[in-house]
């Protein structure tokens, strides 16, 4: 899932589309290593052990980009790989964004797939407001 694949209708309905390699196939060639999609890949994708919680990571990356209006760990693919595979995600306060929203995104971007929230947990938004 990438931000580029989220489609919002005039009536506010959000849909997920997949354009694959249709518009920028050259970006994915071996000769031109500018893998744009890497920035939203979950760490486990690189080891081949991925599932629904990998999409949760990608969803969190999309939410972060929407809030920051910039890629969630830089423009450079090398930086993207380092953050996803090696380092921890550097969470910082986002001006104008509620702490509840930031906590929600943090639940998506947990490196350990076993600790990362599931889709069901994320859909139960009331858990963020419970005392």
What does each model-identified segment do?
Residues 47-52:
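Activation segment
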Residues 110-131:
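Terminal C-lobe "cap" of eukaryotic-type protein kinase domains
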Residues 68-72:
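Structural helix C-cap motif within protein kinase domains
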Residues 96-109:
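Conserved C-terminal C-lobe helix
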Residues 55:
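Conserved catalytic-loop aspartate of Hanks-type protein kinases
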Residues 31-44:
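Conserved activation segment of eukaryotic-like protein kinases, specifically the C-terminal portion
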């Amino acid at each position: 899932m990438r931000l580029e694949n989220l489609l919002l209708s005039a009536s506010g309905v959000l849909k997920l589309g997949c354009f694959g390699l249709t518009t920028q196939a050259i970006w994915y060639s071996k000769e031109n290593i500018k893998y744009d999609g890497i920035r939203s890949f979950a760490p486990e994708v690189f080891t081949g052990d991925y599932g629904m919680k990998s999409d949760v990571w990608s969803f969190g990356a999309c939410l972060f980009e929407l809030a920051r209006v910039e890629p969630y760990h830089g423009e450079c693919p090398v930086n993207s790989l380092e953050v996803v595979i090696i380092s921890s995600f550097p969470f910082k306060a986002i001006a104008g964004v509620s702490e509840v929203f930031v906590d929600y995104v943090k639940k998506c971007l947990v490196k350990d797939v076993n600790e990362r929230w599931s889709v069901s947990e994320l859909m139960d938004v009331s858990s963020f407001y419970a005392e």
